[in-house]
Every structure is written in C-alpha cells, then in structure tokens.
Amino acid sequence: MTERFNGRLADVIRRPLITEKATSALEQNQYTFEVDHRAAKPDIKAAVEQLFDVRVVGISTMNPPRRSRRVGRFTGKRAQVKKAIVRLAEGNTIQLFPES
C-alpha cells in the first residue's frame, strides 16, 4: 500500500460503476469501481478487501482521457476519472443491489 492513502482507504473507492458491460462482468465475479485517479493497484486492493471483507485475485485499471465540456462560450474539462475492474476469489461476492 502506498503512503498517499495510508489510513484513509475509504477515500480510494468513489462509487461502483453500473453499466451494461459492468453488469455482464458480474457473472465472472468482476466488479467495476470508479476510484481516485492517484490510487495505485495496492491501494485499490487493500480498500476493497477491507471495506467489503472479500479476497481480491486481480485488478485491471484504466485512465481514460479527460473530456472537454462546454457551457455557452466557456470551455472546461471534466474531472479526472480512473476505473478499476476488480476480480474476486471464487465464492466471494459484493452486494451492490439491495435485496427486494
């Protein structure tokens, strides 16, 4: 674990990403999260294992380019986003949707 997030692992994971592709990846026990853009793979692994009490087998991260946003004549950039696809050990699950 890097020193940037030492003791603040809850700040690493921002939210789960619920898309069609991410939902289909749940069948392979892969979960997609939006994470802090400064987080490294050891930070993400430690945060997921501690917050959800599961065992992480692998992590894939991607840093897509920032998108431009225009409002009237003003242009700006959207916030930096980093996505992490976390693969869990067999038998471990994360409850993303509440039971009805």
UniProtKB/Swiss-Prot annotation:
GO terms for molecular function: rRNA binding; structural constituent of ribosome. GO terms for cellular component: ribonucleoprotein complex; ribosome. InterPro entries: Nucleotide-bd_a/b_plait_sf, Ribosomal_uL23-like, Ribosomal_uL23/eL15/eS24_sf, Ribosomal_uL23_CS. Pfam families: Ribosomal_L23 (PF00276). Keywords: Ribonucleoprotein, Ribosomal protein, RNA-binding, rRNA-binding. One of its GO terms (biological process) is translation. Part of the 50S ribosomal subunit. Contacts protein L29, and trigger factor when it is bound to the ribosome. This is Large ribosomal subunit protein uL23. The lineage of its organism: Bacteria, Bacillati, Cyanobacteriota, Cyanophyceae, Synechococcales.
